[in-house]
Regions:
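Internal acidic/polar
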Residues: 6-7, 96-125
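Short helix-capping/turn signature of helix-turn-helix
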Residues: 31-34, 42-45, 132, 151-158
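Structural recognition of an alpha-helix C-terminal capping motif at a helix-to-coil junction
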Residues: 38, 52-59, 72-84
Length: 193
């Protein structure tokens, strides 16, 4: 019932934002900024990149509001945009590092500067138990195609159908990736325990 009210509110805000109401768009941002940040942070494990994804997501939402199909859930549409931006960043992030710290072909840049930082906050370390930490590390090490579905399924509590809608893939593909993702996790965690 609350989901229906939220959908109605979102639909109303989208209609107003399409007409140029900046306050309505600001409310959309308020409704989703934390959700998109958590999704992006779980997928990218980098606070700064997650913040960039949030900004890019809302920029794309604003530019493409006229393309949003009101027969679909707004949350699915915005999660798809955020997820796709994360996937794009993960693809671009493929490591291409030299074993040597100093690289002669790039002035002033050494190999250490190219390694992405791990910007986890102290409160994150306090909140995460040892077991959760191991699971999180195992999820981080998953290949991107499994990591995405595992984050959406287990950390964002999305149904298989919702994940299918967000990633624009058949439900059977999502089921397969969830199953294989679980197998990867099981094998990684068995080695650690």
């Amino acid at each position: 019932m609350e989901g229906d009210r939220l959908d109605t509110l979102e639909q109303r805000l989208v209609r107003l934002a399409r007409k140029g109401d900046t306050r309505a768009f600001a409310e959309i941002v308020d409704l989703y900024k934390d959700k998109i940040f958590h999704l992006a942070y779980r997928m990218l494990s980098n606070r700064h990149e997650a913040e960039d994804v949030v900004q890019d997501t809302f920029l794309r939402v604003y530019r493409n509001l006229d393309r949003y199909d009101e027969t679909q859930k707004f949350s699915t549409w915005i999660y798809r945009i955020g997820t796709n931006l994360c996937i794009d960043r993960l693809r671009k992030r493929k490591p291409n590092y030299s074993l040597d710290a100093e690289m002669n072909d790039q002035e002033g840049i050494d190999g250490y500067a190219m390694i992405p930082s791990d910007d986890r906050t102290p409160e994150t370390y306090l909140l995460v138990s040892e077991t959760q930490k191991m699971v999180h590390e195992a999820i981080e090490s998953l290949p991107a195609k499994y990591k995405t579905v595992m984050v959406l399924r287990y950390l964002k509590d999305m149904s298989l159908q919702e994940i299918s809608d967000v990633l624009d893939m058949p439900v059977t593909t999502i089921k397969t990736r969830v199953h294989r993702g679980r197998e990867f996790l099981r094998k990684k965690l068995e080695r650690k325990i």
